[in-house]
Amino acid sequence: MNMQWLNDLLFGVGVGHSILLVAVTIALGIWLGKIKIFGISLGVTFVLFVGIVLGHFGMNLHPDVHHFFKEFGLILFVYSVGMQVGPGFFSSLRKGGLTLNLLAMGVVFLGVLTTVILHFVTGISMSTMVGILSGAVTNTPGLGAAEQTFHDLTGTGDPTITLGYAVAYPLGVVGIIASMLIVRAIFKISVAKEKEKMDSLEHNDDNQAIALSLVVKNPAVFSKTLAEVRQLLKGHDYVISRTMDSRTNSISLAHSDTVLNENDRVFVITNPQNTAVISSFIGTEVQMDRKQWIPTESHLVSRRFIVTKSELNGKTLGSLQLRKMHGMNVTRVNRAGVEMVALASLPLQVGDRLTVVGSELVMPKVEELIGNSVKRLNEPNLMSIFIGIGLGILLGSLPIVLPGIPQPVKLGLAGGPLVVAILLSRFGYRYKLVTYTTPSANLMLREIGITIFLACVGLGAGEGFVDTIVNKGGFTWIGYGFIITLLPLLIIGFIACKGYKINYLTLMGMLAGSTTDPPALAYANNTTNHDAPAVGYATVYPLTMFLRVLTAQLLILFFCS
């Protein structure tokens, strides 16, 4: 029997061989990544090392297929990260984004300083050192920028740039993860406690919706309608959903013409920054369970409905006219796990969960209006994903010309899609784009992307890996790369924990983002089921990517011209 087909499949250069090789690399890597060494497992990061081993034994991809797979995998990964963190990205940026970006800049510039010092101490050419630097911080666009700049300056290429990158990259990944573990050990950090702190901070977020039960005590609001009270409290975000008559203790749905009397009680939804003003203006707070606002004999019920009709995407809550048409009040809106005050001006997005209070008889009509179809929500919105990827590639390819630098700087195929994903997931509703993706679909997209990327990086680096280490001084290059990786991260990690009291979950994301390292983010995500690492990563990634590319070009320009 002719077995040539099997030989071609296993050792050829065709499409089937490439797909099979990537699949085997990923499967083996994920399986071996579950093994714990000293209680630590590398997870999907192990795919990289399986790729290096297979690449060393001659299992290679066709160069064009390799390049496509690697870039497409990276794009899928960063785009899904952007979609995940987008809804909460800008509030996070306002609260701690400046500090995180300054710390990330510190990592970048300490890495550059370490590289320059090693260049003068060891005598290794700067072109090689820039390759080692790019590998040590796992930054492929920086490598590409350095190679292009060197070629433009000299008219020839320098293979040691790529070799330096290849030998430093694997230990770079390990070093970034090691820095997280070392910081955790030094400060005796409990991941569970850090998660509790993060949950507590999110609960006290200025945008979070909180419920108050108030007794009307201010004479200024006696005999006033809720519409008149709203005018007096203009500029403050709140919703009064129900009132309790002080004489009969009967509970009613609040309307704009509802009149407040002394000792009436009101159920208010607001945010922490408005709590004091509203409480002091209306009266005094009393402790009442939410269930007391819906007594068993009442006709009022509370239901949660999911916005699933795409035609509602971008429409304001007030435009639904639920109170006017159906006598219903929306008290809270939950978006991506964040509770928000149900203001009439709030734009709705597919996937929002509305808490609606009103008559049980009218609930089916409201459900029909909003959608509330989990089946529809599970349908993937592929069009918006690929529109976003396309726009991201355009943005990433846009040359940014800076004074005094002959070569334009670009965000690259990773930075562009990340920025666009963040913007679309936050503002896509304004352009009628449904960007909602179920958490499971987003996770699938993210894991497929990162594993394909790691498999390709490993297979590409494996071919000359051992030769470089044994015959070309690669052992010392690995050591220098590890210093460039570890030293800046430990210094900034210490400053972040000791000086700025940065939450460890956010710190992991910031350290991964400051080195533009997807495997480290994957490790951080596996450490906790919180999205704080992804938010920290996305907060610093765009600026870091820009600086990594810029500094790689500047080092070549200043030292190799």
Curated annotation (Swiss-Prot):
Where does the RCK C-terminal domain lie? 196-284, 286-372
Q: List the disulfide bonds.
A: none
Q: What is its main location?
A: membrane
GO MF term (any one): monoatomic cation transmembrane transporter activity
Q: Tell me where the transmembrane regions lie.
A: 10-32, 37-59, 74-93, 100-122, 161-183, 384-406, 411-430, 443-465, 475-497, 504-523, 538-560
Q: Name one GO biological process term.
A: potassium ion transport
> Which keywords belong to this entry?
Cell membrane, Membrane, Repeat, Transmembrane, Transmembrane helix, Transport
Entry's localization field: Cell membrane
Concerning PROSITE patterns, the annotation shows: RCK_C
Q: Name one GO cellular component term.
A: plasma membrane
Regarding the membrane, this protein is recorded as: Multi-pass membrane protein
Indicate the family of this protein. Belongs to the AAE transporter (TC 2.A.81) family.
Q: What protein name applies here? A: Uncharacterized transporter PG_1411
